[in-house]
Amino acid sequence: MGLAGLGVGALAGALALTPGPKVLGQAETLLEARSPNQRHNAKLACEAIDGKVIKPGEVFSFNKTVGSWSRDKGYRRAPVSFNGSLIDAWGGGVCQTSTTFYNAALYAGMELVERHAHHFCPTYASPGRDAAVAYPNIDLQMRNASEHPIEVSAKVEGSRLKITLIGRAAKPAITIQTRIIDQQSPMLLNQGSGDSPWLRSPGKPGYEVETYRITPESKVRLSRDRYPVMHRVVQWSNGS
């Protein structure tokens, strides 16, 4: 699957011709379909990692950098995926920031240490390209494997969440490839009885995917993820 089909923009340049700072990796995701509170929380997480300098050999921990998503830090309650269901919880929406950072880090050549997929595939990223976090136990960790520091720029620009990783390391071009092994379409399920319908679940396809990072020298499998199908459920009841 090409980059255009991933919904994540990225820049990963060829070998640098100058020793000055340059973009090593860049990714962006769209906030248009997110709730106001999800946008707010994603922006707060961006502010927490913006300006972070990752030293050579250092492991960047998203949870340690962002910290808890508590009310006293300004986070709001918003929909979050929990055990296969959507519930309102403090910090809902932060996973969009971790997902965007993950994609930028892949293009920057950072080494994957820890990453978790969501139970269901989120709308803002393609299958295999998401990175779920839940403070403090479910983390995203990436190691700076280069000999130079990497600086994080994380911004919300209109409806776009954009993360850029900047450094002096020379690196070859990197391609991220996602291979869909299996895909399941959601079914329409009617539940209850009556004359008044309401949409209980919008439904999402299910996927099994493998994701690879490709350089001129190698092709490395990053992950194999399974996302179950979420059926479209219409609940019927008697109108009041």
Which stretches of residues belong to each language-model region?
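N-terminal Sec-pathway targeting helices
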Residues: M1-G7
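Well-ordered beta-sheet/strand-loop patches within structured domains
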Residues: G7-S240
